[in-house]
Amino acid sequence: MALIRVKNLLLRTFIGFNPEELANKQDVVINIEIEADIPEEALLADEPVGIYNYKTITKQVIELVQDNRFKLLEVLTKNILDLIMLDERVCHARVEVDKPHALRFAESVSFEMEAKR
């Protein structure tokens, strides 16, 4: 079992339902934790065949986030989690999405979800 983390992935998307949020992209910061089954042979071979490719899933997350609009932080988080869980090798995943400056006196607001098989 391996634990893969993608930390502080900074992306821009349409997130929210207020008029200003509907008109302008905003920053979101995404943290992903993936527990995946990686065969021992793949680790011993030191080759990319058979491993969980974090670059591939990161590109998919980027595409999902940047190419869509979301009213709710919760829906964005769930969509990312569902995308990650499509890979059968993933045993457990956790996704946290921060929306910086969502509240006047707070650095950010975040929503976190996890899924297990």
What are these regions (language model features)?
Residues M1-R117:
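N-terminal, polar/charged subdomain of small-to-medium soluble alpha/beta proteins
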